[in-house]
Structures are given as structure tokens and as C-alpha cells.
Amino acid sequence: MIGIAEIKLTDNEIEAAIAVLKSGGLRQGPQCNAFEEEFAAHVGAKHGMTSSSGSSALHLPYMSMLEPGDEVLCPSFTFIATASMVSMAGGKPVFVDVDPDTFLIDLADAESKVTSRTKAIAPVHLFGNPCDRPAVEGFARKHDLKIVWDAAQAHGAGYDGKDVGSWDDVVCYSFYPSNNM
């Protein structure tokens, strides 16, 4: 059977994991705080906050910004969480075509999907390739939309010398083993 990922851990990593397990604090402890600070600094973000999964990382901003029935533009080629977290927050995902060469969100198609209920756009960086930041930000400004960037497959990716993790409004990562890191 072909596995999803081969786990290769150093002795130091194993010892660090054991120390956390022995501390009894599997969440919100000093290691978690240190990781949040170090990862935020690594990607150039002002703040970093961990969650239990990439899906929950996407759910949190939608809970804070959407009213029931608000729409979010989502690429049609993505992991299910991109749209399902919009629905879980009471919003309505509106699917947008993707560019056939990059599989990234097609802003020309997105233009035709904007309504008075559209509140956000959810561009997904795929395969380590970042979305066109100036184009997405210009689109969002034009339509007064928030941006929830899905960077689950873009650890270390950048655009014009800026890590995707430093972009506004919200950037969400996932550390699931099948994501490229």
C-alpha cells in the first residue's frame, strides 16, 4: 500500500513531542505559543494563531465576518473545506472557474459571480504556486470584499518577494501530511 506520507522524525523532535505529552498541555501551552510566534515571524505575519486543522482555520474568519446568506467566491478546484467552512458559518459558497493552466481562481469568471450579497473571496494557492496578489487585491478592493487566502499548499511560497503568509486580510495554513510543505 502506498501511504500518504512517510514520517521521518529526529530524536530531538521525538523528545520535544514527549515533553509536551508529559506536560499534560496539548493545547495553548508554551510550545504552542512559541510555534505561533515563530511561524508568524517566519512568514512575515503580524499575528499567528493555531487551530486544530486547516479546515477550522478557514472556519474562524468566516464566523467573524459572515451573516446568514452572505456569499463567498470560491474556486471550483479546491479541497472541500474551502466551501464547506463558508456553509458552516452560515454563508453561501459561490463557485468560480479556475485558470486551466494554473488551477488558480479565475478573476474574469469571478467578476460575473459578484452580487450584493458577496462579502469575501477565497483564493487558494495550489501546488506551491501563489495567486496573483495584485490582481486579487484589486478585485477585492473594487467590490469591497474581504480576502481569506487558503495557503494550505503554499508553505514558503511568495510573490514579489513577500511570503504569502504576510498578506491581508487572513491567511490560513494546514499541516496535514498530504500538503506540500
Task: Put a short name on every predicted segment.
Residues 25-71, 85-89, 94-97, 162:
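Phosphate-binding glycine-rich loop
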Residues 149-181:
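Conserved active-site segment immediately N-terminal to the catalytic lysine
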